[in-house]
């Protein structure tokens, strides 16, 4: 059975067809989070934009779980440069059939600078 778990702020976990999908995994330092970055399961991590409270613990979680990070081109490249083992870049309006389901990036109106100040590309919804 598919399941959604809200971890506070924009962070959530989805169990879809046996795959663990994290969205905007801001867990460490998030007082609402019911799980820590070293315990959360993940096969895929979706990042909507570059702000630290959405990129959150994505790199550490991806390194620990070998999860694929899915985001826009700029964020996917930044994550790879930070040591994420696998990324999948998509562009706004484009979609891709992942093992857990189809993901299409939609436009979001928001900032997207990454934690180190570099350009995070266009923010997106999924």
For each feature predicted by the language model, list its residue ranges.
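Catalytic core of the metallo-beta-lactamase
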Residues: 7, 12-16, 97-126
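Histidine-/acidic-rich catalytic cores in large beta-rich domains
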Residues: 86-91, 104
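Mobile, glycine- and charge-enriched loop segments
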Residues: 63-69, 122-123
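Short, polar loop motifs at secondary-structure junctions
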Residues: 8-9, 71-77, 91-93
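Pre-active-site segment of Zn-dependent metallo-hydrolases
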Residues: 13-51, 56-63, 74, 111-119
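Extreme N-terminal starter segment of soluble prokaryotic enzymes
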Residues: 1-5
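Catalytic phosphate/metal-binding cores of nucleic-acid and nucleotide-processing enzymes, i.e., regions
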Residues: 44-46, 68-70, 82, 87, ...
């Amino acid at each position: 059975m598919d399941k959604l778990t809200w971890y506070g702020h924009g962070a959530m976990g989805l169990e879809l067809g046996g795959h663990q999908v994290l969205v905007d995994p801001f867990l460490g330092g998030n007082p609402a989070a019911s799980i820590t970055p070293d315990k959360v399961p993940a096969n895929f991590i979706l990042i909507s934009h570059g702000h630290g409270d959405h990129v959150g613990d994505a790199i550490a979680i991806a390194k620990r779980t070998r999860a694929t990070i899915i985001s826009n081109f700029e964020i996917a490249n930044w994550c790879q440069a930070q040591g994420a083992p696998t990324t999948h870049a998509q562009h706004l309006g484009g979609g891709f059939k992942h093992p857990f389901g189809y993901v299409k990036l939609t436009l979001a109106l928001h900032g997207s600078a990454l934690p180190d100040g570099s350009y995070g590309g266009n923010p997106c919804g999924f």
